[in-house]
């Protein structure tokens, strides 16, 4: 995912945590906050060390990024933070995709109807 689509700064994460809205399911928590002037979404991913070793955490992050790449054109321009919860570590990429799509639909972050 290109740099323009990333949230990296701790101050940006903290601002979204404080002022953003959250939606969750068993596997993921989504924090979102609108931002004036954004033409596309920006994504931050947080996977705790409690979920496993670096290999496991990176696999989860890759699956999350891939899901957002697939839906890049379908997303509303928002700042989005995805936090992985413990059940996500045992999921396949397809299960992660379905779970993320579910929580994104609940959060109403798609700009059109996704099957």
Curated annotation (Swiss-Prot):
Entry-linked Pfam families: Ribonuclease_P
Record-level Gene Ontology MF annotations: 3'-tRNA processing endoribonuclease activity; ribonuclease P activity; tRNA binding
PROSITE patterns linked: RIBONUCLEASE_P
Top-level taxonomic group: Bacteria
Keywords per UniProt: Endonuclease, Hydrolase, Nuclease, RNA-binding, tRNA processing
EC class of the enzyme, as a word: hydrolase
Enzyme nomenclature, EC number: 3.1.26.5
GO biological process, any: tRNA 5'-leader removal
Keyword tRNA processing (UniProt): yes
Keyword Nucleotide-binding: no
Catalytic activity: Endonucleolytic cleavage of RNA, removing 5'-extranucleotides from tRNA precursor
Cellular component, GO annotation: ribonuclease P complex
Intrachain disulfide bonds: none
InterPro entries for the chain: Ribosomal_Su5_D2-typ_SF (IPR020568), Ribsml_uS5_D2-typ_fold_subgr (IPR014721), RNase_P (IPR000100), RNase_P_CS (IPR020539)
Assembly: Consists of a catalytic RNA component (M1 or rnpB) and a protein subunit.
Function: RNaseP catalyzes the removal of the 5'-leader sequence from pre-tRNA to produce the mature 5'-terminus. It can also cleave other RNA substrates such as 4.5S RNA. The protein component plays an auxiliary but essential role in vivo by binding to the 5'-leader sequence and broadening the substrate specificity of the ribozyme.
Family in the record: Belongs to the RnpA family.
Name of the protein this chain belongs to: Ribonuclease P protein component
Gene designation per UniProt: rnpA
